[in-house]
């Protein structure tokens, strides 16, 4: 009932930059503001076409300087104005450093502070239990503490980022719990199938 199968809830591919050259987002990279804003505008147009509710505004690989932080905030403020007359929002996602070395945004609390500094209900956190467990742990308490700022949830197994039916996190407990806490959005599953997609999708039977 609550696990998303569709593409409409989050659209997130158009702000990664040039993946072949090592990009993993652009919005916090001071030298690429123009490119980041062009990508935001393109993502916004695509999101309107596919009726997406959210755009994933990826920070990118950069240092933790004040300049990078200001760049990220300024680009998000630009994005805030871009979407203000639409039903489309933006999500920022803390990623784990094991899989994403050098990524700017790595902690849920850091993401919350950025949301506060941007000052818009259209900017929310994408809370990916896989990344949060690896980087920080204490996932349920951390989710509850930041719930007003969470706009989307993703799940996958820890470790391996495979189907969310085994590993360190028990999603048969976690998913009902986040709704008890007051979360009202969708839960997306972003993972690498252990075998094939068709064989792996059986895990969803436990979440109907």
Q: Which residues does each PLM region occupy?
A:
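Short, small-residue-biased leader/transition segments that mark boundaries at the very start
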Residues: 1-11
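A generic structural signal for well-ordered alpha-helical segments
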Residues: 4-5, 47, 83, 178
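Short secondary-structure transition/capping segments
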Residues: 4-5, 22-26, 67-69, 103-105, ...
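Short glycine-rich loop/turn motifs that provide flexible caps or phosphate-binding loops at active sites
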Residues: 7, 16, 59, 166, ...
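Mid-chain, structured segments of secreted extracytoplasmic proteins
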Residues: 13-27
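Active-site acidic/histidine proton-transfer and metal-coordination neighborhood
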Residues: 23-124, 134
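Histidine-acidic metal/acid-base catalytic patches
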Residues: 51, 89, 105-127, 131-208
